[in-house]
Every structure is written in structure tokens, then in C-alpha cells.
Amino acid sequence: MTALYGHDAAVAAFRESFDAGTLHHAWLLSGPQGIGKALFAEKAALRVLAEGQGRVAAPGLDVPDDHPAAKLVAAGSHPDLMRLERLPRESNPAELARSITVDQVRGLSRLFGTTASMSPWRVVIVDSADDLERAAANALLKNLEEPPPHSLFLLVSHAPERLLPTIRSRCRLLRLSPLVPDAMTSALREALPEASDAEIAELVAAAPGSPGRALAFQGLDIAALDKAMGELAREGDPTNARRSALAQSLALKSAQPRYEAFLTRAPSLVAAEARRRSGRALDDALRTWERAQSLAASARGLSLDPESVVFELAGLLASLAPASASR
């Protein structure tokens, strides 16, 4: 299994609870997208299942690849582990369903309706809890309120504040932070062994703290996208020509990965500009950043029209330009 970088404190907190025999039955793993929350959940689940078969002599959450539990988890066939995640659409298997359904959550009865097969533990990974439809969230809550013995729920969430308060209250919150540059470099170097130092450095800069997003940006010519956004922020767009062109180009179905990159990069560029300002100009930039963050989050969560989103976000970038540039 891939190594976990940059989350030593979170690993230590989980291990301390597990080793003391006080492991909480539900953990809410929170933090920005792409920093390794799902990988943490996978490794924590595997470690608990493996330890249930006997002591594992490996540090942190590591389990040797030749361990029986590791082989089963890697094959997706461990009988004591279930994952709740968005499934491929029946109408178009190339796309994922919009949410995790209540029927999927009810399927946990297959896991908890029998005794554990290989260890005392039965583990559920929810990736992500943000994707639960309302009925599914309520069904999961019932399991969290009355957990079966030796059950462990690992809920991944990019926006825990949007979850049902009752779900949050049943979980122990474990915050995972964005990776520092050295950890980012190590994670990307493992994932992209053939990449040059310059390519790794460009990806680190393109998605600070988030190796998952950095990998998604690979091959998208992020430098060109940043150049277009930078020109908007420096020179403005008095005729709307620049943002119209950008919106049309990123709205194409083939441009979906670049659109996703834009949703990440645009608020980051506004934040970078805010850090260079002071006084009233700083206040204005911070308000612009808040609007950009909110719009990008809504675009992801509500599947807003990409062309309209890009046009509006590009307008926020253009509003950062000096007044003289907009004439």
C-alpha cells in the first residue's frame, strides 16, 4: 500500500487510542481534499484488521504487504471491511453517481448481520461522508448511535460542518492538515518516479499541501492556466473578452480536469494577492477571496453550470486589477 506522508500526529493519536484499548467506534477524518484522508482511513482499517489476527511488528499504521489481511484488502475482498462510496451510474458506468444511497448504507446489515470472519473487528470506510444523501446519512446515524461490538467507522469528510450535527457528535474528530513541501515532494516522488525535479516542483507549487490534487493536475498545463488568471488579476477585463474566452474553453466536456483545476487555483490566486495588500485593499481582497471560495465550493457541491462559474470567478479575478488597468 502507498506510504502515508505528513500525518504523523494523526497517526500517533489513532495509535494511542487503539493501543490503550480505548478506540472510539467512529472517527471523522477531516481536512482539505487530496491530502490523504482516504489513504489514512485505508491504512487505519487495515492495521486494525491485521492486529485482530495478532500483533503486527511495524511502525505507525503500516502492515507488511504479504500479511493475509493486506492481500485481502488490496484485492477488495476482506470479509470484515466495507466501503461506502459513490458507485458508477447504471446509465453511464464511466461517471459516478451523485451520492451514496440509503440502500448502500442498509447493505451494512450484511457486514454486521454475521460474526466477524478473520478478527474481532468489522470496519466501515465512508468516502466521503459529504456524499451521503439525506436518507443515507440518517441510516448511517442509526449505526453510529448503536454501534455493534468491535465495529469501527472511518468517515472521510472535506467539509464536516455540512454533515448532520448528530453524526459529528457521534464521532471523534481527527483533523488532517495540508502537507508541508518536503512531505509533498516525497509523496509525489513515490507516485511519479519518472518525473523530473522541475516537474515535481511545479506540481508542489500548483497544489500546495495536496498531493491528490497535484496528481490530478499532472499534464494539464497549469502554468498556462495560471498565466491566464494572472493576466486577469493584473490587467483586468474591461470588455469581458478574456473571461468569456476562458469560460468557453473550460466549459467543454473535454476540459473537465482543467475546470476542476481552475476551481482550486482561482481562490488560491486571490489569497496570494490578498497577502500582498494592506489596509482597505486587503479588506477588499479578503472579501473577494471569500466570494471565490464560496463559489468554487458551490460549483463542486451543486454541479453548477461550468461556463457561468468560470465567467463569474474570472470576474472576481479581474476585480483585483488596479483601477487604471480596467479603463
Across the structure, where does each feature detected by a protein language model lie?
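Charged, glycine-rich active-site and insertion segments that engage polyanionic ligands
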Residues: 1-47, 51-72, 149-151, 158-267, ...
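Loop/turn-to-beta-strand initiation segments
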Residues: 119-123, 148-154
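Conserved Walker B
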Residues: 128-132, 144, 160
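Residues at the beta-strand->loop junction immediately N-terminal to the Walker
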Residues: 30, 126-127
